[in-house]
Amino acid sequence: MNSEPSWTATPSPGGTLPVPNATTPWLGRDEELAKVEIGILATVLVLATGGNLAVLLTLGRHGHKRSRMHLFVLHLALTDLGVALFQVLPQLLWDITYRFQGSDLLCRAVKYLQVLSMFASTYMLLAMTLDRYLAVCHPLRSLRQPSQSTYPLIAAPWLLAAILSLPQVFIFSLREVIQGSGVLDCWADFYFSWGPRAYITWTTMAIFVLPVAVLSACYGLICHEIYKNLKVKTQAGREERRGWRTWDKSSSSAVATAATRGLPSRVSSISTISRAKIRTVKMTFVIVLAYIACWAPFFSVQMWSVWDENAPNEDSTNVAFTISMLLGNLSSCCNPWIYMGFNSRLLPRSLSHHACCTGSKPQVHRQLSTSSLTSRRTTLLTHACGSPTLRLSLNLSLRAKPRPAGSLKDLEQVDGEATMETSIF
């Protein structure tokens, strides 16, 4: 038995990690399985490249100021495009040629970019979820200094991905598959027997287990905050309806008093969650579910292969390994369609026109679940339009209780954010 670690040149996915217990011979392979893999990779490449390019081109056409979600979707589409170009495409070419065709420098560069795209895509999704957590659970903190809270979250995934991918440069190299055979390939080389197990375990923890744990914690807190918000809104709605029923049985002066009491609580609810925010939370949640569904089989097979010494290596297992490794790439195909599903403006013009023609009439929604100071005043005046005396009393009551400058500024910021998010999603 060869003293070198028996790790094949078959990467996973796209040549990112070495795979043990391969059934293909050292100097041959299963051609039928290779054809299936080439077909799947070609399909994934076309779908991922086309979908993410469509999203990038659509977002690039918008001339207005980009919202936070706009920027995160833009960069997540960039990372998914990187998965297609730097991970799927090299593996597709590699499967066609069977052996790596290139220099040692190109081998190390390809391996580095393959894992970099995986790290960047995962951590950008994590940053997007953290941004939604801040927007829902700590809205004022993210609104007072939006640039200082957004750009670090966008830059951090790229920086971490660039650093954490560096081991690939030292692990992989162009070397002989069997000493003295003269057949070269881009393979991993571990000096210790426990090296593959340690490396794959670390990669699984860094790319899948820990991010999923953080994502779950964030969405648990987000759901708790939304539940509290809905409970407060329900109670406020009951009090407001009770106040208007009192107005039906009382004089106009009683109405002015009830309106004055209701106004501060309605306006000062800066922390209420807009429908636009809830919609972006739903979109991010669906992306997270797709990410877990696509990557869970891949990392499960990877961990099984290095921790179970009795892992079978029959042909059927090789097929299962190969299909599981390719499933992770589907995440980059799903994300663009999730964006388009939550925002018809990102659809191609032909599909968007078809949806407009066949769909129902668009409904007009409020940009905020809680109106601003101006819209609240208009609502009160609309209900009281039949009484000049009541209009005067309401105006006087509004002028008699001025809002602090800081609160009004916060309200304007909340309204601006909701408008921006509604225009994109």
Curated annotation (Swiss-Prot):
Which positions form S-S bridges?
C107-C186
The family database entries (InterPro entries) matched by this protein are listed as: GPCR_Rhodpsn (IPR000276), GPCR_Rhodpsn_7TM (IPR017452), V1R_C (IPR015076), Vasoprsn_rcpt (IPR001817), Vprs_rcpt_V1B (IPR000628)
Q: Could you give one GO CC term from the UniProt record?
A: dendrite
Q: Which residues are glycosylated?
A: N21
The keyword ATP-binding belongs to this UniProt entry's keyword annotation: no
Tell me what topology the record assigns in the membrane: Multi-pass membrane protein
Which UniProt keywords are listed?
Cell membrane, Disulfide bond, G-protein coupled receptor, Glycoprotein, Membrane, Receptor, Transducer, Transmembrane, Transmembrane helix
Gene3D superfamilies from the UniProt entry: Rhodopsin 7-helix transmembrane proteins
Query: Which stretches face the Extracellular side?
Result: 1-35, 94-108, 174-202, 305-322
UniProt GO MF annotations: identical protein binding; peptide hormone binding; vasopressin receptor activity
Give me the segments passing through the membrane. 36-59, 72-93, 109-130, 152-173, 203-223, 285-304, 323-342
Q: Where is this region: Disordered?
A: 1-21
Its principal location?
membrane
Which residue windows does the record flag with biased composition (Polar residues)? 1-13
Membrane topology (Cytoplasmic): 60-71, 131-151, 224-284, 343-425
Q: Where in the cell is it found?
A: Cell membrane
Pfam families in alphabetical order = 7tm_1, V1R_C
Set out the biological process GO terms recorded for this chain's protein: adenylate cyclase-modulating G protein-coupled receptor signaling pathway; cellular response to hormone stimulus; G protein-coupled receptor signaling pathway; phospholipase C-activating G protein-coupled receptor signaling pathway; positive regulation of arachidonate secretion; positive regulation of cellular pH reduction; positive regulation of cytosolic calcium ion concentration; positive regulation of glutamate secretion
What role is this protein assigned? Receptor for arginine vasopressin. The activity of this receptor is mediated by G proteins which activate a phosphatidyl-inositol-calcium second messenger system.
Q: Which family does it belong to?
A: Belongs to the G-protein coupled receptor 1 family. Vasopressin/oxytocin receptor subfamily.
> What is the protein named?
Vasopressin V1b receptor
- Natural source organism: Rattus norvegicus (Rat)
